[in-house]
UniProtKB/Swiss-Prot annotation:
The lineage of its organism: Bacteria, Pseudomonadati, Pseudomonadota, Gammaproteobacteria, Enterobacterales. This is Probable septum site-determining protein MinC. One of its GO terms (biological process) is cell morphogenesis. The keyword Cell cycle applies. Cell division inhibitor that blocks the formation of polar Z ring septums. Rapidly oscillates between the poles of the cell to destabilize FtsZ filaments that have formed before they mature into polar Z rings. Prevents FtsZ polymerization. Belongs to the MinC family. Pfam families: MinC_C, MinC_N. It comes from the Bacteria. Interacts with MinD and FtsZ.
Length: 234
């Protein structure tokens, strides 16, 4: 069988989507910096899609684009564009127009509740949400002002986030982010570590950073001296 030099296949990627409103560029830029300050390294050079559905036809697209890039993001495309003039300006700037499916994670305009996001709005750490089912690829869980407990597997491509601690009694292959609002005393516990990424209060480690003795084992992840540490549990 002849082996072709390339293959073209369809695939699905999980992306952050930035939803723009009709506000002055400097105000929006400052707000964006405030939103990402708890995760400065996690979002450095991160790919992001821009939704302009609620923007007026008179926005200065080049100024907006430059403001987003200056915050450390790589724009991969723009969605929600219904105005012909704006669409042409976006295309001329070198970016594609995206056909947007169902949004899975609206990070910068509060966290939405849809069929792929489960959000828990709590004023106090009174009750910890518990998930007994597997967290599937593409699904995102967010526990607001709370710890999070999962008694099953977190699949590759899934993302679990909590403002408090995270406990996972299962195999972890997706992303795990604790202390999402900046609490660096939060910790992550899991019984089988294969995670793509773990993060606490903006500091993160990728799977390639894990030591061999922690991979696939029961571990505790915590922050000390502004660095993440992973220790194997007995």
């Amino acid at each position: 069988m002849k082996i072709l030099p390339i293959k073209i296949k369809g695939s699905i990627f999980t992306l952050l989507v930035l939803y723009l409103q009709n506000h002055p560029v400097e105000l929006f830029k400052n707000n964006l910096r405030d939103k990402i300050k708890n995760f400065p390294t996690l979002f450095k050079n991160a790919p992001i899609a821009i939704n302009v559905e609620k923007c007026s036809n008179e926005i200065n697209w080049n100024n907006i684009k430059n403001a987003i890039i200056s915050c450390g993001f790589n724009i991969i495309g723009v969605s929600g564009c219904k105005n012909g003039k704006l669409k042409n300006n976006i295309i001329k700037s070198g970016l594609p127009i995206l056909s947007e499916g169902k949004e899975v994670f609206n990070f910068f305009n509060n966290i939405n509740l849809d069929d792929k996001i489960l959000s828990f709005e709590k004023k106090n750490y009174n009750k910890t949400p518990i998930f007994n089912s597997p967290i599937r690829s593409g699904q995102k869980i967010y526990a607001n002002n709370s710890d999070l407990i999962i008694t099953n597997n977190v699949n590759s491509g899934a993302e679990v986030i909590a403002d408090g601690n995270i406990h996972i009694y299962g195999e972890v292959r997706g992303r795990v982010l604790a202390g999402a609002k900046g609490d660096n005393t939060c910790q992550i516990f899991c019984t089988k570590l294969f995670s793509e990424l773990v993060a606490i209060s903006g500091e993160y480690l990728l799977s390639g950073d894990f030591s061999e003795d922690t991979i696939g084992n029961s571990v505790k992840i915590y922050m000390k001296n502004k660095k993440l540490h992973i220790v194997k549990l007995n």
